[in-house]
């Protein structure tokens, strides 16, 4: 399954196919299946947007409900390969739009970050990782336009503030 881009795509596509077959076998059309990936690696050799685009073009042909993109910065531009200099999500959304929902997580901390992401139109859904962990009422604060109350940095000196308990010491952002 290694070597060419096409051969390397065999494994993830077979996993998706297997999940879809199990959903069908169990007669569970309501069971949501998606695929999560990080679109580009900073080192060489590493995954480029050219390879990611090929995989996404195949994934949108599958009976999945979403593709979830994980990166450090929602607006990160493509480093190398196809789409260089263009926001990765813009490149990806041009492929997924109208075929499968795109979910993105990546460095959104402030209310203005979330608003900018929503207004970009680069994805159908926005996920919150760190922001959600350090603001247990994130959704309510954003909905009620109380972005000034958002914590944007983790306070390892006060783990009791978070519902992660002692595990907070293992988080590095």
Q: Residues of each region from the PLM?
A:
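Flavin-dependent oxidoreductase catalytic cores
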Residues: 1-173
